[in-house]
Amino acid sequence: MANKLVLISLLCVVLVAKITQAAPQYAPGDEPSYDEDTDDSDKLVENDTSITDEDYAAIEASLSETFNTAADPGRRLGEGSKP
């Protein structure tokens, strides 16, 4: 039992040592370097202002329409009804 405990503790120490060595090392006062950002600002598109008041009215009207009225796709027509 003691051998297992010693072995498990040794493995934990090795795991902690591996993790700490894998972390980047910086001297005091050093700042980490990051990848350079690419300048993709030329690909940005302004907001679309081509939507008119009529378009907004059509959208508002469609919100009051009924929806989700399709038949249940899990059932076949005629199934489940008692003769």
UniProtKB/Swiss-Prot annotation:
The lineage of its organism: Eukaryota, Metazoa, Ecdysozoa, Arthropoda, Hexapoda. InterPro entries: Thrombin_inhibitor_anophelin (IPR018932). One of its GO terms (molecular function) is molecular function inhibitor activity. One of its GO terms (cellular component) is extracellular region. Residues 73-83 have a biased composition (Basic and acidic residues). Residues 25-51, 64-83 are annotated as: Disordered. Residues 1-22 form the signal peptide. Belongs to the anophelin family. This is Salivary thrombin inhibitor anophelin. Glycans are attached at N47. Interacts with human F2 (thrombin); the interaction results in thrombin inhibition. It is found in: Secreted. Increasing concentration of NaCl decreases affinity for thrombin. The gene is AT. Keywords: Blood coagulation cascade inhibiting toxin, Glycoprotein, Hemostasis impairing toxin, Platelet aggregation inhibiting toxin, Secreted, Signal, Toxin. Salivary protein with anticoagulant activity that inhibits host thrombin (F2); binds to the proteinase in a reverse orientation (opposite to substrates). Inhibits thrombin-induced platelet aggregation.
